[in-house]
Each structure stands twice: as structure tokens, then as C-alpha cells.
Amino acid sequence: MPVTSVYQKDKPFGARLNLSPFECLKIEKHSGGADALEFISNKYDALTQVLSRADILKIACHDCAAHALQAVLDYEQVFRQRGFARADIIKITGNGGGAQALKAVVVHGPTLNECGFSQADIVRIADNIGGAQALKAVLEHGPTLNERDYSGADIVKIAGNGGGARALKAVVMHGPTLCESGYSGADIVKIASNGGGAQALEAVAMHGSTLCERGYCRTDIAKIAGNGGGAQALKAIVMHGPTLCERGYSRTDIVKIADNNGGAQALKAVFEHGPALTQAGRSNEDIVNMAARTGAAGQIRKMAAQLSGRQ
């Protein structure tokens, strides 16, 4: 349904909602932000019947928010009739692509219920960027995954992330090969259940055999891959692992560094700046403890720069 928009010359957009200049700016900086402010001004009475001021702000602070707000007006009654709470509507709509996600819940929700998914499951899947595609992917790939002994809970866990649709498709594509390579269904779910899960599964399929040949166990590989940026971390081990081992780091050390969000960057930082830190008296154990933290790459670079400045 098209977004209704009538310019009101006598009232600044957002004035009826008492938006501060900062709040207006927060909305305007998004794609379609001016349209969102105009829509709020024009549809103030209808919006405030179903949404609080905080709800409207939350939805409006995303790209294409006018369409999302219109979708709330279009579908709110249907959602209530199907047992969804207002909080569910806000969760689904408060993401990029919220309008499409709401429509997808209306279209696919009944079928998903028939397949055994609860309202809470549907909200969890839809409440992400790309939620509409993820709901459709559950319908498309769910039966195949069930036949392969993945539970409904597994499917929701995989689908309920940014990029969930791609992750489900990747499980269908790479799952059989990974199982033949010795990974369990639980391993595959763990790897897939992250933003970037599809890329992580592909990276395991691509680099897993090389890493196993170098002495890394599948448990280590699944553990590393099951983090945000897991695909990059596995590739970083393939690239930098041999050199780090030559410098006295053990595989356990490398896994410890890689097994974090930002693990790839941390490994690269140790590879590039480790020698300088060693020359300054830091032991490998010190460097590993420093690197095995989220955001460690920046800290290592900063420390190396400080040491360089003293020379």
C-alpha cells in the first residue's frame, strides 16, 4: 500500500509529536527520513492510537521508516487478532525492512503455525534485517532440514539472525558434506547461528580439511566458526597460522585468539606486531592473553605504535 503524504505548511514535521531537533535529525539522517517525519505529522492521530511516542521514534529511526509506519497501520489489527502483542509488532518493525517483515508475517504466519512454529518463533525470525526473506526461507527449506533431523528450534536459531535466509540455504547446501567430514548437526547449527553464518559454513567446507591436516580438531574449527566473523577467522588461521607456529605460538594459542568476534583482525595484528612486542619484552603468553579479547587488534596496534615512538 502506498504511503500517504500531504505537506502541511503550517506545522513543522514532527511538531505534533513534540520531537526535539536532535530526534528530528536522528530520523532525517536515514534514507527516507524526511518522508518519515512528514508521515508522522500527517498520520499523528492514527499512529498514536496504536503506538506510543517511544514506539514511533524507534520505528522512524530506520531507512524507509514511512513504509514501516504505514505497515503498522495496515496490519496492526490482523496481528492483534492472531495473538501478537504490540511489543511484537514494534520488534519486527524496528529494523531495516520492517514493512516487508510485517507483511511476511501476515502472509506466511498461518502456514508457519501449521508447521509447528509458535508466534514467539515467528517474531524471533522476523525481528532481524532480512526477516521477510528468513520467514520465506523457513517455509522453503524447513521440510528438508526436518528430514535431516534438524529440529524446529534449530531452524529458528539459524533463521533468527541477520542473513538467516542465506544461512538456512547454506545448511541445506553444505550440511551433508560437513556431516560426512565428521561435524555433528549441533556443530552445524552453532556455526550457522550467527550473522554471517552462511559464509562461516562455506569457510568450514573450504578450509576445514586444510586446518585438520595442520592439527586443528573439528571442535576447534566449529568453535572458531561459530562467532561473528568466523569465516574471516578461519581464513586468517590458514594464512597466518604457519608463521605464528614458527614464532613459538601453539595451535591452542591460535585457537584462543581466533575464538572471538574480531578474531581475524586479532590474528593479523599478532602476525604484524608480535615481533615488536616480543622485542619489547612481552612473552608469547602475554601477547595471547592480550589478543584473545574482543577489540584486541586495535589495542595491539596502539601498543606497537607506542613502542615504535619510544625508539
Curated annotation (Swiss-Prot):
Gene3D superfamilies: 6.10.140.500
Cryptic repeat repeats: 51-83
Annotated Cryptic repeat + repeat ranges: 282-311
Repressor is among the record's keywords: no
Residues in Core repeat repeats: 84-116, 117-149, 150-182, 183-215, 216-248, 249-281
Highest taxon of the lineage: Bacteria
Keywords for the protein's UniProt record, in alphabetical order: Plasmid, Repeat
Stored InterPro entries: Ankyrin_rpt-contain_sf
Signal peptide (from-to): none
Cryptic repeat - repeats (start-end): 19-50
Family per record: Belongs to the transcription activator-like effector (TALE) family. Bat subfamily.
Function statement: Does not bind DNA, probably because it has too few core repeats.
Name of this chain's protein: Burkholderia TALE-like protein 3
Originating species: Mycetohabitans rhizoxinica (strain DSM 19002 / CIP 109453 / HKI 454) (Paraburkholderia rhizoxinica)
Gene (name only): bat3
